[in-house]
């Protein structure tokens, strides 16, 4: 039976989001202390413009926000990993990096063998979204659970990639680490560029809307137009 794993995709400016969230929480706290005194509703969202101005007069030192900022998480990608015995090493590597139960990286002991927090550092619009560099985060590193690189499994090289396919990124033959990519395109000519060169080991089961959001974050040069990272991951 095929194993199923997930990646929660986050997008945006985390620092700016934290600042907006802090402003909203401060507004909630301020309102809870003053609602009864001034006869105000219990939640910031219920305040009229006049009531908002009243609360601003109570606290002139802080910027108040009356609605929570939009969530950074844009959704979940759920993948079915291949059940082929000929891909067992590749699927075991990916699943373990999703759960993060293998401890620290051998070549970067301060980093975990875990996709959590990993950047999707390369997103080529209408082609691929790549991430999983657990050691450096920028595409120049990566490490498998086997301690470095591991060889291509031939069964995966025989699978023709399609939109939603999950494959190992590499820097040449037999150079798989933790880096992976998800196929964004349906175009045959672009798919042909991937065929036989990368080990395909999974397919998207759920989250096609999230795949579209990833594509929207992509540019022709591969640099995402907004920060994108894995904010949650594991087995389903």
Give, region by region, the residue ranges found by the protein language model.
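Cross-family detector of peptidyl-prolyl cis-trans isomerase
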Residues: 1-236
């Amino acid at each position: 039976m095929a194993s199923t794993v997930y990646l929660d995709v986050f997008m945006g400016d985390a620092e700016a989001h934290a600042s907006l969230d802090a402003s909203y929480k401060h507004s909630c706290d301020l309102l809870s202390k003053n609602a009864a005194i001034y006869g105000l509703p219990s939640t910031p969202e219920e305040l009229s413009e006049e009531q908002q101005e009243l609360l601003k007069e109570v606290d002139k030192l802080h910027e108040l926000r009356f609605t929570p900022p939009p969530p950074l998480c844009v959704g979940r990608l759920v993948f079915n990993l291949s059940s082929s015995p000929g891909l067992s090493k590749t699927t075991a590597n990916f699943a373990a990096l999703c759960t993060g139960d293998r401890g620290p990286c051998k070549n970067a002991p301060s980093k975990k063998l875990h996709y959590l927090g990993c950047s999707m550092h390369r997103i080529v619009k209408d082609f691929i979204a790549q991430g999983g560099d657990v050691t450096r985060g920028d595409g120049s590193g990566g490490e498998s659970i086997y301690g470095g690189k591991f060889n291509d499994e031939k069964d995966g090289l025989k699978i023709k990639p399609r939109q939603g396919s999950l494959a190992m990124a590499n820097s040449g033959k037999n150079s798989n680490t933790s880096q992976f990519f998800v196929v964004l395109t349906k175009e045959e000519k672009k798919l042909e560029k991937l065929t036989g060169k990368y080990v395909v080991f999974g397919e998207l089961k759920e989250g096609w809307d999230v795949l579209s959001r990833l594509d929207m974050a992509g540019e022709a040069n591969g640099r995402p137009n907004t920060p994108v990272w894995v904010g949650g991951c594991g087995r389903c």
